[in-house]
Amino acid sequence: DHHLIFEGMNEPRMVGLTNEWWYLSGDKLCEESVATINQLNKLIVTAIRETGGNNKKRFILVTGHAASFDYTINSKFEIPADPENPNEKRLLVSVHMYAPYTFVMHPDMSINKFTPEFRNELYQNFKQLYLKFIKNGYHVVIG
């Protein structure tokens, strides 16, 4: 049933800290955050599946730190096990990708042409998502 898709968290992060939005490999707080979010994703999947009924088969979005593309690709983000669906991938990876940043988020509105460099950045990002998740049977939702 695709009428309802659960998302347990939206942009979970270390609010107010230096690496609130950016992942720094090896940074103690970043690594602790990733481990905590991995645990929370497991708890969310378990809680939803244990309610029974259609929730045993519904799609669930799981996310990395800050729902960040960078964190999700480069950290120790893990997709939790889904024992209710061992032969079907019912967990979807959720990432927010504000890229190319200069084109989509920069306050200078004069940057309004989609350049080959911007295209290449998106291509590389999509390629990384493909190699890490889609190639392994997981779907990705980009917000």
Give the residues covered by each predicted segment.
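Active-site region of glycoside hydrolase catalytic domains
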Residues: 2-109, 125-143
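Mobile cap/lid helix-loop segments that gate and shape the active-site cleft of serine hydrolases
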Residues: 111-123
